[in-house]
Amino acid sequence: MRKISANYIFPVSSKPLKNGIIEIDNTGKITNIIDTKGDLKEIAGLEFYNGILVPGFINTHCHLELSYLKGKIKSHTGLTGFVKQIAKLRDKFNETEIKDKIAKADKLMQHEGIVAVGDIINDTISLEIKKQSKINYHSFIEIYNINSEKAQTSFNNGLEILKTVKENKLKASITPHAPYSLSEKLFEIFKNYYADKQEVVSIHNQESEDENKLFENRSGNLAEMLKNIFKSYDIVSNINNSSLQSYISYLPKNNNVLLVHNTYTSEKDIEFAENYSDNLFWIFCPNSNLYIENKLPQIDIFVRKDAKITIGTDSLGSNEKLSILEELKTISNYFPDIPFSKLIEWATINGAKALKMENMLGSFEIGKTPGINLIENVDIKTFKINENSKIKVIA
């Protein structure tokens, strides 16, 4: 049994506690939360820390499989430039090297106080590491193919990987890569498969301006790249609308849908999407956005629209670290009016809800085992994080 206290505790599900105490058992499960009303007395065995205690972080978007690309991709090349660089490097690393980088990335996230991850996969190379990890993983099995004749084959390949992941007793679901990389037929197969399910799915959304141009009038660098690679492509045929408004009807609305990046999502897009489904979660990976497109989403508009926001790190191919705190620092720097309590909510309970893990993670509540992070070097009076703020994993 441990008794843990700090200047402030942010349970997330309830108001902050000044000099509060969290009691946990040997498994990390919370057995008691004490509101001292700020009057902390000497208690035998009490651990006191300077800073703010928050629940373990939830990383709702990552690509562990791309960890071997750290430092290998040039920044600010735009999405098409990023994709082309990956294509050139993909076959230059062997399985042992890739697994080693995945294992190191997993440990790195644990060190950064991350307790759950929504991880994009294209094969089963990460499964052994995930089985041994302390992190709770939900693997999103990507499907993509813009040739309608190969739609069923592509989906069947996803089903095979899904079967293997489930046999390893890990959480997983099939998920579309991006609106520009699936044929209309593959989208239909995907939607029909999840029509009667209540799962979690994910899709890269409006990561570049070229994505919107592609759907609005078949122009831009992305359209050009697809033309050069494929003689014809059968993507969603709805023209004259933004990307999101063109394809959203193919997303299964009774499932949690994680829309990733949203760098070029407009206010009209948000309204349109929120009217379509109540189960949308908008994932921001700000450091990756700056690395690839050198642009951030209009996060303040999402806040004003009361959208459900979560935080991701993306991969080490487009990020120097896999740290939720570093993502929050970037958001706080560019959007200083967003309160600390809101940022922590996005990084914890919202992510847990998005991945359907809120029963055990995301907030300090009796019976949960959410992990306990200490944020050090934070202004206790203003609750502002800064470039020197850092994470210490307490439990």
Task: Please annotate each region the language model reported.
Residues T175-I189, N205, H261-Y264, L290-E293:
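Active-site glycine- and acidic-residue-rich loops that bind
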Residues M1-G20, D306, T348-A395:
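Active-site microenvironment of metallo-dependent hydrolases
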Residues E23, I52-L53, K70-K134, S154-E167:
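Alpha-helical scaffold segments that flank or form the walls of functional sites
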Residues N157-V200:
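Active-site gating/metal-coordination segments in enzymes
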Residues Y68-D100, H138-Y144, E209-N254:
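Active-site gating loops and adjacent loop-to-helix segments of metal-dependent hydrolytic enzymes
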Residues E224, Y250-K253, C285-P286, K295-N377:
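His/Asp/Glu-enriched, well-ordered alpha-helical/loop segment
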Residues G56-T60, V117-G118, Y137-I141, A172-P176, ...:
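Hydrophobic faces of well-ordered beta-strands that scaffold small-molecule active sites
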